[in-house]
Amino acid sequence: MLESLQPESHLLHDEPDPGESVYECNECKETFSLEQNFVEHKKTHSGEKSPECTGCGEESSQASSLTLHLRSRPRRESYKCGECGKAFSQRGNFLSHQKQHTEERPSESKKTPVPMTTTVRNQRNTGNKPYACKECGKAFNGKSYLKEHEKIHTGEKPFECSQCGRAFSQKQYLIKHQNIHSGKKPFKCNECGKAFSQKENLIIHQRIHTGEKPYECKGCGKAFIQKSSLIRHQRSHTGEKPYTCKECGKAFSGKSNLTEHEKIHIGEKPYKCNECGTIFRQKQYLIKHHNIHTGEKPYECNKCGKAFSRITSLIVHVRIHTGDKPYECKICGKAFCQSSSLTVHMRSHTGEKPYGCNECGKAFSQFSTLALHMRIHTGEKPYQCSECGKAFSQKSHHIRHQRIHIH
């Protein structure tokens, strides 16, 4: 009965001890403890060919050994993406990657896998970049990277935000931007707890705590925490003002300065405080204003203990103790601890008065002065004397009046 089940083997024992051979070859009398080893051995007598590696020709007595061998061998061919040059060892991963390109350009047919040649592989390993921009000469190792770069020169921005209409040259920038609308801020600062929607902004913010300023101006040696600040600063040396107002023709060195200026013409103040009704031109000003109502002041000076609602205010305050005045007027040499103070001061030389009253047309060099002036038209008098009840439009007038009661 047992021999009919295993016609080519001979059972040595009914219940063998662990590790003892139980399968005997009828041809050469060699014994085996595992059936699969015995079966593979029989092929040496029958002349049956062992599994062979198609890559190097190596034979293996067992299929499992061949599988292990194949895993250890470097793959000769990869699947290379014709769009961006990225290579994959497995076809499935390659096809999944291809969907990124077809989603952006649904009208295009899918690219077929291109086996990666030795020349292309060497090109990527050696850093060769055969795709050069005709406008600026910058080179790339993938054609799709060049196409994305060229949008900088053409101004093409095909990816538009459905929330605010802002457009971007690349899909990845749109995805990052959309975090602003969702309110999602997954990147949190371990020092102060401030959260950001983008990791890049957190990295830049952390330099406030570390004091790191990796971007240095070769002209004057001044350093900055972010590259965009350095580029904007360098325009103070070159005099370049690439951003021009379409309404009045005034030019600015920074885009944010132009955006801020343009609100003068349209009178836009879209951000309103729910507590007191004060309106602001920019969301950041509203956020800063909210601290007045909450009274929160998380940033404290180590020298005198004074606390502030914003870290930027603390940084400016610390300069009182250090005497640091990094912002100097090139015309008269007067120095300031804040860049905004220098900006206002410069208007005393240029005569610039960018803040105009919509009621009477009178112009002012500072927005705060315009705000005070507007109370003449609105009749607003927020400062009231506790002694006699008389009200004033300006705090300084209120303080001067109170001296009457003191004397």
Curated annotation (Swiss-Prot):
In this chain, composition skew of type Polar residues spans 115-124
SMART domains per record: ZnF_C2H2
Q: Write out the GO MF terms.
A: DNA binding; zinc ion binding
Subcellular location per UniProt equals: Nucleus
Give start-end positions of each zinc finger (C2H2-type): 23-45, 51-73, 79-101, 131-153, 159-181, 187-209, 215-237, 243-265, 271-293, 299-321, 327-349, 355-377, 383-405
Q: Which InterPro entries match?
A: Krueppel_C2H2_ZnFinger (IPR050826), Znf_C2H2_sf (IPR036236), Znf_C2H2_type (IPR013087)
What Gene3D superfamilies does the entry give? Classic Zinc Finger (3.30.160.60)
The answer to whether UniProt assigns keyword Cell membrane to this entry is no
Q: Where is this region: Disordered?
A: 1-21, 39-72, 96-124
| UniProt feature, compositional bias: Basic and acidic residues | 39-51, 100-111
Family per record: Belongs to the krueppel C2H2-type zinc-finger protein family.
Query: What does the record note on quaternary structure?
Result: Binds DNA. Interacts with GATA4.
* Name the UniProt record assigns to this protein: Zinc finger protein 260
Q: Which species is the source of this protein?
A: Mus musculus
